[in-house]
């Protein structure tokens, strides 16, 4: 089989599996294993002296381990046969994508908000965001869901696909390890400030290009004149060097306002506003965000396939 198809077929199959099923909640998932490894390291090494150095070793060695494990699986399955590799690689691409699950989690929050009220919506939202949700209004809940969908469209969809395009599923898994490290220890509170410093910076570096690609693709699928100007105006109104790009794109598409003051892990964080239309947000906005996420995911997959076919097929 042509090597190009060893990249394209698992990509398409993994995308279709994610589109149909999303992350299975009852089957072992690599990211759960990554999380267990990180929890073990945090318990044993985030103490005493040299926390910053110990955290740096963890942040660099764990992604290397994930990538090497993926490389070993690649070599082993290719030794069996191309179709064996394609099947296994498809499963890892499926595990590496989070679009279906991201939308499912967001829909569960807004559905519970509509059917069971604000308190239930706050509780369900707390499962997927780091901010304190105990005093959020319905508008605040919708805003948090939309911000999360925009940010994770980059972190959970475009970035994994970007690294798959560069290095196959081993690179995709290495990136997922970095992203999991950042989500678990990449905080600025007293507990993680030193230990998680390298993880947070590495995640910022690896998401630099994907975040900007995400905003570009969001602007393309939205087909809204003036959206690029809106993105450039607000993309740096965020503590993260990357999250402002997809969030400003989503705020521009919806003509709404993100940001403001929120409590994270006991600390009040004042976020600059992204957008200036402080309007009410509704379920209709969530449906638009879902459509944008699906279209950006498809556009990313199609772009990778097109590049491989144009560059490597002679």
Which residues does each PLM region occupy?
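Substrate/ligand-engaging "lid" and interaction regions
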Residues: 179
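Glycine-rich phosphate/dinucleotide-binding loop and adjoining beta-alpha-beta core of small-molecule
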Residues: 183
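Pseudouridine synthase
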Residues: 176
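Hydrophobic alpha-helical transmembrane segments
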Residues: 1-173, 186-314
């Amino acid at each position: 089989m042509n090597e190009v198809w060893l990249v394209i077929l698992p990509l398409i199959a993994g995308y279709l599996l994610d589109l149909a099923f999303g992350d299975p909640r009852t089957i072992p998932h690599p990211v759960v294993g990554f999380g267990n490894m990180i929890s073990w390291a945090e318990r044993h090494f985030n103490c005493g002296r040299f926390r910053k150095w110990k955290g740096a070793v963890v942040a660099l060695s764990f992604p290397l381990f994930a990538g090497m494990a993926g490389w070993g699986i690649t070599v082993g399955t290719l030794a069996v046969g191309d179709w064996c590799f394609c099947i296994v690689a498809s499963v890892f691409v499926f595990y590496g994508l989070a679009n279906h699950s991201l939308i499912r989690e967001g829909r569960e929050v807004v559905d519970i908000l509509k059917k069971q009220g604000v308190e239930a919506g706050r509780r369900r939202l707390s499962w997927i965001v780091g901010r304190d949700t105990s005093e959020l209004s319905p508008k605040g809940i919708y805003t948090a869901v939309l911000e999360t969908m925009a940010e994770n469209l980059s972190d959970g969809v475009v970035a994994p696909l970007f690294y798959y395009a560069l290095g196959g599923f081993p690179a995709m898994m290495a990136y997922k390890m970095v992203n999991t490290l950042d989500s678990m220890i990449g905080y600025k509170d007293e507990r993680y400030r030193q230990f998680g410093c390298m993880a947070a910076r590495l995640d910022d570096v690896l998401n630099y290009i994907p975040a900007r690609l995400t905003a570009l693709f969001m602007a393309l699928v939205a087909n809204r004149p003036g959206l690029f100007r809106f993105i450039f105006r607000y993309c740096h109104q965020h503590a993260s060097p990357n999250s402002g790009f997809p969030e400003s794109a989503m705020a521009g598409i919806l003509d709404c306002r993100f940001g403001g003051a929120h409590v994270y892990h006991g600390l009040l964080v004042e976020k600059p506003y992204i957008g200036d239309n402080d309007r009410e947000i509704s379920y209709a906005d969530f449906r638009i965000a879902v459509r944008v996420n699906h279209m950006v995911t498809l556009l990313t997959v199609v772009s990778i396939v097109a590049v491989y076919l144009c560059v490597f097929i002679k």
